[in-house]
């Protein structure tokens, strides 16, 4: 994902970020099951960034 796009996404509200975190985490595990390492790396980078932003905000309500 383009870094600029990711930076924009990280400015989203907490609820949207949580939903996006869950979605990218699910996609990561789908790639894991399919042994798609490129996909795993792609989604891991995104959900790690989102998770870090949510931790900064101290917001983990699902």
Predicted regions and their residues:
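N-terminal acidic leader/helix
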Residues: 1-32, 55-62
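Short, charged, amphipathic alpha-helical segments
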Residues: 37-48
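Repeat-associated, polar segments at repeat-unit boundaries in modular proteins
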Residues: 50-53
């Amino acid at each position: 994902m383009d870094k600029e796009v990711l930076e924009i996404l990280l400015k989203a509200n907490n609820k949207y970020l949580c939903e996006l975190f869950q979605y990218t985490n699910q996609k990561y595990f789908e790639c894991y099951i399919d042994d798609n390492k490129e996909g795993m790396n792609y989604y891991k980078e995104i959900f790690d960034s989102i998770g870090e932003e949510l931790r900064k905000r101290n917001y983990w309500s699902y």
